[in-house]
Amino acid sequence: QKPALLTTTLWDFPSQQYGDETQGDKNYRGATPAYIIRNLLHRYTRPKELVVDPMAGSGTTLDVARELNRRALGYDVNVTRKDIFHCDARKLPLEDEKAAFVFLDPPYSTHVHYSDDPRCIGKLSALTPDYYKAMELVLDEVKRILRPGRHMALYVSDSFQKGKPFCPIGFELFQRLSRRFEPVDIICVTRRNTTLDKGNYHKAAVEGNYFLRGFNYLFIMKKA
């Protein structure tokens, strides 16, 4: 049985994947919950339309799109499977206004080592302007390839590392998105990962007087 579409701006999923099929790789660090892609594509695309993921990771977007009879293209500097093209999201090999929908799940600063490729944005700290400059180039490419009147979504978390300043990545990227697209809505997605299940992490957060990341932003935007 397929999951029902969600109708509020608070999304909480029991797992990374749904059903008996595999969407992406559940063991891939930072894998996007397949439920998110399913909800977005049901709302903002139609069968046979082209869905693009410039930071495809383990291919969750591609699998969900094809399951829903959408065409899909995925790009990444760290290729994990044959149907993902080796490419920097700042320079996509796609013609203008070809995509009906674009999904982005970028690195949230330097928390996860994704690749040894020097072009990997995950090597850039969100404490520096370089991260945001790189993401602006990615957003420019998304705007270029997206058809007018169609939607894109960006899934991201803020960043906090003990002993370092808090990085409001979500707010920073939303400002940059708003200069390129029309805001449609903001969804709060509950984070479910092994870190949040470990009691010692919660004990450390209390003792250190800081908070663990409990949610991700899902920004939904429209190209004028």
Predicted regions and their residues:
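Class I S-adenosyl-L-methionine-dependent methyltransferase catalytic core
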Residues: 1-224
